[in-house]
Amino acid sequence: MSYVIDRRLNGKNKSTVNRQRFLQRYRGHIKKAVEEAVGRRSITDMEHGEQISIPGRDIDEPVLHHGRGGRQTIVHPGNKEFVAGERIPRPQGGGGGQGAGQASNSGEGMDDFVFQITQEEFLDFMFEDLELPNLVKRHLTGTDTFKTVRAGIANEGNPSRINIVRTLRSAHARRIALSGSSRAQLRALKAELERLRLEEPHNFGDIKAAEEEIERLKARINRVPFLDTFDLKYNLLVKHPNPSSKAVMFCLMDVSGSMTQSTKDIAKRFFILLYLFLKRNYDKIDVVFIRHHTSAKEVDEEEFFYSRETGGTIVSSALKMMQEIMAERYPANEWNIYAAQASDGDNWNDDSPLCRDILINQIMPFVQYFTYVEITPREHQALWYEYNQVAEAFSDAFAQQQLVSAADIYPVFRELFQRRMTS
């Protein structure tokens, strides 16, 4: 009996490596399709991946072949029409094959290649090259600290960490698997030899044949090594980093009466995308939700996205609450502080200069990055022009963008959180 042992470390997902190589090769096509999908469907609709279509011409492999034209000597087996030395006129048309008619100078020769990417792969491409700007370590004495913890068994490792019990158990199982049938035959032959010696002591031929077969089986069993490199098992120790870069994101959303339902929906979709990005890319991050109209209120995630409360507009109330929470819970020497604000720009006239002063004097000196998105198809409001002064004073830590429609959310989001090149 033959045995096939699959020693591949990726046995259950045999095509994973090839799939990753394929995704890397056609990264441009996939990123374009993901960007189109984000603009087409709801931000909350992330329970599935996306169908990707790649034109057939882009998946062709380069090959070497004879060019058209020239003189060729070809042997056609079973040819009954021509004899050696006859000249055959060149076929008309520029296309290959045996189709009738002239070759066409347009059209495609292959169907598009369509495949499905998973939700995990979809989100990977969606948030590729994005990060929180200016993230630094806070409250540290030096380098990162790590904690070594047990993480199971590995097939490779340091000889000093070999797990003897698991190694011998694996070796024993392998020897049983490889020599099981031979051992069964050996037991049967020994019983047969014992019977021959008792019942047929003069049957020297069968006794000798049984003894030779027993020796052959013993030699076959002995050829199975006691220990194989595949049997070696090691205690796996991994280093878990202790959190050293603590970050908090303040989400400030205007829910005043001037915000139409469409404008509120765009603001919510922007914050849903931001929240999804933070939770996927950062393990240790706090998110503070603040809704405001004439007064500000810290709320939980559910109320932030689904509450229907509304009122007048005093933007400074949200900034004041953010500053109070920063002072109370998030000291700047220990935390990386970020903020994202969404509004339609309408504000009580005397309040916009106050917002500028609060930002410049009480918030911006202590935050890593502050983003403001104004959701309006009209001209910018007074708040935008006051924030221009903040952008001039803190050009590296303050950014503002305009959203006109839901289609602008993803491009603006990528622009705000694009990974920056560091020298």
Swiss-Prot record:
Residues 84-109 are annotated as: Disordered. It comes from the Bacteria. It holds the Pfam family DUF444. Belongs to the UPF0229 family. HAMAP family: UPF0229. This is UPF0229 protein PST_0721. It comes from Stutzerimonas stutzeri (strain A1501) (Pseudomonas stutzeri).
